[in-house]
């Protein structure tokens, strides 16, 4: 005969006390929160985390530290005092007219490069997405400059935009004097057009991939309603690739912020009179050539903060529009 005690239901432990099973489940939940749903993923991501820490986090932290000290490169084994100077390096950066000119140059670059990159890559991707003769050839030809070494393409552009080059000969008396890359007004716009042309292939590829995800039924419905090509493009294509447009814009802004190779090769590093220099080029010249890494680090930190602010504002605007 079953006793009354054996039939009595088991009561939960008093408040604040957990049974062995509950404690184990709680511990597992804490592990999942700390390491993710699958802790084994931490093992696979460890090499990438190490890569980020060594090549990005540590150099960035060191640059921030250097920017607050009077720092010089020395021979191995030589120890020199590196006093803390507070914001003195940042004050020197903000007071330097060459730095202000470099940021103005990048602003000019972005005003030209970003709209051109977005508009041309989207229009060309839309055209290449249609059924046209030699479509594969055109897709490949637009991608060739992107994978070609900058030294080779720069040589072509130096020839084209020289005083006796093809562009100047075609324009005749309308060509600027002095020629494009030694002209204070035209040096940076010419560099912006070159960077746009060279990077167009990868952005066309991004838009082509995005266009595959736009439902064809939307185009068919718009065509049935009598919408023109422009109306279909504005009402169907542009909203359908909005996320890629954000990505292309961000990549173009980052490209402008990191501009170095193009002015270094096309104008010899900022000529004429600093009108084609960039902040990264300024970092190289002051930090490496002139041995002022403290000044260069402060400039680099300001540049990183500026790019992060631009990216943050753009993300905020995108969320509000969505």
Question: What positions do the PLM features span?
Answer:
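A structural signal for multi-pass alpha-helical bundles of membrane permease subunits
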Residues: 40-322
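Transmembrane alpha-helical segments of polytopic membrane transport and secretion proteins
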Residues: 1-45, 133-135, 231, 313-322
């Amino acid at each position: 005969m079953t006793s009354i005690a054996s039939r009595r239901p088991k009561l939960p432990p008093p408040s604040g006390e957990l049974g062995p099973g509950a404690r184990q489940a709680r511990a597992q939940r804490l592990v999942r929160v700390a390491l993710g749903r699958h802790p084994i993923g931490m093992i696979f991501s460890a090499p990438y985390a190490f890569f980020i820490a060594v090549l990005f986090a540590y150099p960035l932290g060191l640059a921030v530290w250097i920017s607050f000290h009077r720092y010089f490169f020395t021979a191995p084994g030589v120890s020199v005092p590196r006093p803390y100077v507070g914001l003195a390096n940042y004050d020197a950066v903000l007071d330097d007219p060459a730095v202000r000119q470099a940021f103005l140059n990048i602003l000019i670059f972005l005003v030209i490069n970003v709209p051109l990159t977005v508009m041309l890559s989207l229009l060309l991707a839309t055209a290449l997405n249609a059924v046209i003769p030699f479509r594969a050839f055109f897709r490949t030809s637009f991608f060739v400059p992107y994978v070609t070494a900058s030294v080779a393409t720069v040589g072509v552009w130096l020839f084209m935009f020289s005083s006796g080059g093809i562009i100047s000969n075609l324009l005749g008396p309308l060509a600027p004097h002095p020629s494009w890359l030694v002209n204070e007004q035209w040096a940076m716009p010419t560099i912006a057009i070159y960077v746009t042309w060279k990077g167009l292939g990868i952005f066309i590829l991004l838009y082509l991939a995005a266009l595959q995800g736009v439902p064809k039924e939307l185009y068919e419905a718009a065509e049935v309603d009598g919408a023109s090509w422009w109306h279909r493009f504005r009402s169907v294509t542009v909203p359908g690739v909005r996320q890629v447009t954000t990505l292309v814009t961000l990549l173009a802004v980052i490209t402008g912020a990191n501009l170095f190779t193009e002015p270094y090769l096309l104008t010899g590093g900022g000529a004429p009179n600093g009108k084609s220099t960039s902040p990264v080029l300024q970092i190289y010249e002051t930090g490496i050539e002139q041995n002022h890494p403290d000044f260069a680090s402060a400039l680099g930190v300001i540049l990183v903060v500026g790019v992060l602010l631009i990216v943050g504002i753009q993300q905020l605007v995108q969320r509000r529009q969505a």
